[in-house]
């Protein structure tokens, strides 16, 4: 039975970053490339990519993982090193790498799924929602050395996830058309079972029992199929945030990762001080997430226990002052990903848009 353990939670403040990317051809169009990039035993992933490169559901979606990072100061260098290695590895096989929450022109009916048994099982069981799941995300792991603390922190993080989604939203196009959303990826992904905003868990045992029950009843094959926006990762001993869209610009990834790390560390200290935590209705959290995926940078978010809302700008100002991190301010001052994609598409053409998503371009 593939479930985790409370014993996994034995490190505090460590980091791991998982980024999902698209394999594309010279023009930026999606193409199947995992066979060569992952399974070419004459030219396998090496160096920082060794054992840290894997495919996702579709043959044009690939994932990287950083090494375990002991300190947040190592994030920028590590993320860049992994990306540089991936771009070089792809180029050696005749491919390029692109990133966004969704590839604007990828039509899921025309793309092939991988043949890995785990994914084939999901396709058979979940059917349509998984068959169309061409999404790519950014997943951030922060180590927590106490399982109950990790569960409490995951509970508290939930209200902060919609603003994070709004900041990262860059997937307005899906299947070749404009969805009208800032993050269509978030909407498409939450059509899968066991996704979206999780409920509040009383303690680690409550989460663990859910994980165990879901596996034992055959609702999921393994713990990894609890795809919530945030979860205590019972294998890695981390709090894992899975909300953001994937990013082409590494500085955006780094800003998001640094903020999540600061947020987790702040909540860890508050848990140690005996704070009781914030109770907020799931419906409010879902409404805030909808605002983020629909409006992106223009979203407003309902404040727990209040009739008031906060704008994204107000949220960023508050968090920057509270936690002493300035990456969000820099990120907010830049053009949002969804807006940029629409501008490039409208003012130029699809080729310019696709080029802007490639990791080896300065566009």
From Swiss-Prot:
Record InterPro entries: GCL_type2/YbdK_subfam, GCS2, Gln_synth/guanido_kin_cat_dom, YbdK
GO molecular function, one term: glutamate-cysteine ligase activity
EC numbers, comma separated: 6.3.2.2
Keyword ATP-binding: yes
Catalytic reaction equation(s): L-cysteine + L-glutamate + ATP = gamma-L-glutamyl-L-cysteine + ADP + phosphate + H(+)
Task performed by this protein: Catalyzes the synthesis of gamma-glutamylcysteine (gamma-GC), the main low-molecular-weight thiol compound instead of glutathione in halophilic archaea.
Family: Belongs to the glutamate--cysteine ligase type 2 family. YbdK subfamily.
Name this polypeptide is given: Glutamate--cysteine ligase
Source organism: Haloquadratum walsbyi (strain DSM 16790 / HBSQ001)
Gene, per the UniProt record: gshA
């Amino acid at each position: 039975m593939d479930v985790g353990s409370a014993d996994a939670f034995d490190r505090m403040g460590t980091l791991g970053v998982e980024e999902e990317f698209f394999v594309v051809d010279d023009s930026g169009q999606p193409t199947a490339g995992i066979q060569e990039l992952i399974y070419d035993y004459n030219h396998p992933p090496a160096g920082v990519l060794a054992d840290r490169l894997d495919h996702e559901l579709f043959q044009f979606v690939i994932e990287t993982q950083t090494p375990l990072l002991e300190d947040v100061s190592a994030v920028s260098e590590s993320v860049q090193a992994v990306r540089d290695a991936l771009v070089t590895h792809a180029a050696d096989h005749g491919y390029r790498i692109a990133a966004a929450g969704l590839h604007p022109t990828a039509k899921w009916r025309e793309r092939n799924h991988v043949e890995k048994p785990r994914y084939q099982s999901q396709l058979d069981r979940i059917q349509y929602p998984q068959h169309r799941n061409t999404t790519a995300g950014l997943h951030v792991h922060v180590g927590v050395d106490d399982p109950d603390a990790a569960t409490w922190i995951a509970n508290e993080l939930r209200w902060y996830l919609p603003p994070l989604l709004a900041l990262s939203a860059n997937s307005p196009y899906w299947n070749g058309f404009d969805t009208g959303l800032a993050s269509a990826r978030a909407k498409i992904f939450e059509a899968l079972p066991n996704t979206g905003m999780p409920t509040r868990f009383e303690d680690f045992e409550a989460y663990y029992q859910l994980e165990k029950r879901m596996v034992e009843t055959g609702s999921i094959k393994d713990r990894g199929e609890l795809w919530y926006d945030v979860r205590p990762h019972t294998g890695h001993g981390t709090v894992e945030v899975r909300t953001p869209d994937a990013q082409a610009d590494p500085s955006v990834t780094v800003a998001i990762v640094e903020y999540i790390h600061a947020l987790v560390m702040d909540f860890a200290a508050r848990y140690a001080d005996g704070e009781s935590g914030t109770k907020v209705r799931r419906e409010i959290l879902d409404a805030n997430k909808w605002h983020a995926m629909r409006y992106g940078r223009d979203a407003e978010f309902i404040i727990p226990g209040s009739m008031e809302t906060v704008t994204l700008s107000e949220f960023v100002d508050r968090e920057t002052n509270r936690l002493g991190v300035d990456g969000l301010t820099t990120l907010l001052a830049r053009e949002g990903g969804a807006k940029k994609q629409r501008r490039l598409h409208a003012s130029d053409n699809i080729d310019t848009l696709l080029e802007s998503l490639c990791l080896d371009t300065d566009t």
